[in-house]
Each structure stands twice: as C-alpha cells, then as structure tokens.
C-alpha cells in the first residue's frame, strides 16, 4: 500500500476501502473486469478507430513515413498497438498498407486474443523489445489506473479511498514519489480540489517506448497540460455509450484524462488530433462540386469520406484529442 488510511481498511459490514488505483485495477483487469468482457471496448463506446477506416489509413501512412527514417539495417518494420482492444486498428492498418510492405504487427492487450484475428498479428500482454518502427497507443494511457488525491480543509493532500459501490472517503496524506509528482505537475488549487496522480502513466509510457530501438512512439488520448488542469479532476465512468458515475465493480469503464505533458520525453511534440490527421492527409474538406457532374459516384464516395474525416477532426469532439509524438533516434 502507498497510503495510510485515517480509518480502518474495512467497515463493520466488511466493505473494503482502497485507493482508486487499486480499485480500478481490479474493476478493469481483474478476473471479472470490464476489459475482460467478450464484447470489448467497442461494445460500450466509440473511439476514433471505430469512427472511420480513415483513422487506420492515417496510421498506415504514419508507419510508412516512419519506416523511411529507420536505419538501413532494419528489414522488418514493427507496428506495436498498445491497448489493442480486439485488434480493430491493426486489422485496418494491415488492410491499408501497400502490398509487400515488410511489417510485423504486435497487439498489446490484457484481454484474450479474439477468435478469427488475422494470423499476422502477434498477441501479448507486454510490448516487444528490441524492435524498430511505430508504437501507437490510442486511448490506452487513460485506462492505466491512477490514484486520486483531494485537498482537505487543512490544505493537506490526501488519497481518496473508494468502496466497490463507488462511495468515497479520504485516506492518509499523499507522500513520497506521488507527492513529488503532484508538486511538479499538478499543484493543489486549495481545499476540495482533486487531482489524478499520473506517475504510473508516465512510467507505463516510458516502459513501452523503451522497447523501441528506433522509430516513433505515439500516444493519443484526451489530455490536459500544466496551467490547464481541471480543478476537480476528470475521473469518470462509461457504459453502454453513456457517461456514468465511476463505480469500481467491473460494470463500467473507469477513466481519467491524461497529463500527457508529464509523459513526454526529450524531443516530444504535443499536437491536437485535428492537426495530426491533417498532416497525414485527413482534413474533412468537401470534394469540389464539379466532381458531382463529371463523376457522380466518385463525388458521393468523396463526400462520405469527408464526413468521416470531419468527425475525426471536429472541434469539441475527437479532433480535440491530443497526440504525443515521441521520436526514438537510432542508437
């Protein structure tokens, strides 16, 4: 345990009080956890991967661009999808790549390999090491469990403890590495203010990136930066396509926005999804009206594609996600 509770660890009726990080780990990844369910994330919410095949096409283009900058000795280009869900993104990228492109695809996911998945996709719980290419993590870091801190009336930051029914109370003071992280990345805003302690995410990201010998690592998530942290945190739940109260009983996703600036290493760049996809040729621009006369079928296809691109880049929606580009120079 990284805390000392101000009360007993369990109520008289046996209800256990634990920090949010521990509760989330059980609720998402335990034997009956939310992410162990057969339907997977797609059964409860829609990510950019599910919104349009254009997203996979953009990642395929990013992979080919990354491959051009790899050392000549690299004969096989790795594509590592961290938090792969049921393999939807990798399946789409493999379909979008040019014929004969020398890719080796890795899905990193704690759930079991789905039946019928493309046999070219290797499945495991940990990122590979010693590979060169593109590591891509779409909405992974927000599901790396973190502890929650709340400032009490005396100005002391304390761990928030939670029961399986979602009820909360304050525990012991935040100390050690967690306190240092808050001091550096999310200073207190006064009594009642809350913060998610992102240190485990920083460490998870650094460990994933360390597996690349050369190439590019990209994390995509809803995020915030220093100077723009939400005063009461962002911890929430999702189930059946709706935002719900976060209850760590395995019945809903539990997530919180990511302090991506804290994850960023030397040479990293943070850009909006809108700008990132535009760099990769996804803009949402409507096709010229003249095409409707010269080639009506092509115009209809282009119009549909523009609509999908507009959703991926929309302000106030998916376009506001943040992309962290972390280059990994060859050693």
Predicted segments, located by residue:
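Rossmann-like AdoMet
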Residues: 1-126, 131, 149, 275, ...
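Short helix/loop capping segments that flank catalytic or ligand/cofactor-binding pockets
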Residues: 36, 144-146, 228
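Active-site flanking residues adjacent to catalytic metal/cofactor-binding acidic residues
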Residues: 80, 108, 135-138, 220
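Gly/Ser/Thr-rich loops at beta-strand to alpha-helix junctions
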Residues: 85-88, 142, 224-225
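A short, conserved alpha-helix within the catalytic core of class I
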Residues: 124-126, 141-156, 197-207
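Conserved acidic residues
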Residues: 132-133, 215
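A mobile, often basic/glycine-rich helix-loop segment
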Residues: 134-186, 232-240
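Long, Lys/Arg- and hydrophobic-enriched amphipathic alpha-helices
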Residues: 179-331
């Amino acid at each position: 345990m990284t805390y000392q509770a101000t009360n007993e660890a369990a109520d008289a009726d046996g209800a256990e009080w634990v920090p949010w990080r521990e509760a989330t780990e059980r609720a998402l990844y335990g034997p009956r956890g939310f992410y162990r369910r057969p339907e997977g994330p797609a059964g409860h919410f829609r990510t950019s991967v599910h919104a349009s095949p254009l997203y996979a096409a953009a990642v395929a283009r990013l992979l080919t661009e990354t491959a051009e900058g790899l050392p000549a000795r690299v004969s096989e280009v790795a594509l590592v999808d961290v938090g792969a869900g049921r393999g939807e993104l990798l399946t789409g990228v493999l379909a979008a790549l040019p014929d004969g492109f020398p890719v080796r695809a890795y899905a990193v996911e704690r759930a079991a390999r789905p039946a019928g998945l493309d046999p070219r996709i290797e499945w495991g719980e940990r990122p590979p090491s010693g590979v060169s290419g593109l590591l891509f993590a779409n909405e992974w870091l927000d599901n790396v469990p973190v502890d929650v801190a709340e400032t009490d009336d005396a100005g002391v930051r304390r761990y928030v403890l939670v029961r399986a029914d979602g009820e909360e109370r304050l525990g012991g003071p935040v100390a050690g590495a967690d306190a240092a992280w808050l001091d550096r990345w999310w200073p207190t805003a006064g009594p009642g203010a809350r913060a998610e302690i992102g240190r485990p995410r920083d460490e998870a990201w650094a460990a994933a990136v360390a597996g690349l010998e050369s190439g590019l690592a990209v994390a995509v998530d809803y995020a915030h930066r220093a100077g723009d942290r939400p005063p009461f945190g962002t911890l929430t739940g999702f189930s059946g396509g709706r935002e719900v109260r976060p209850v760590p009983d395995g019945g809903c996703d539990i997530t919180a926005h990511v302090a991506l600036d804290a994850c960023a290493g030397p040479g990293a760049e943070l850009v909006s999804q809108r700008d990132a996809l535009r760099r990769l040729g996804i803009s949402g621009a409507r096709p010229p009206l003249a095409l409707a006369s010269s080639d009506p079928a092509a115009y209809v296809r282009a119009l549909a594609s523009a609509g999908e691109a507009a959703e991926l880049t929309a302000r106030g929606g998916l376009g506001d996600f943040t992309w962290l580009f972390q280059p990994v120079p060859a050693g």
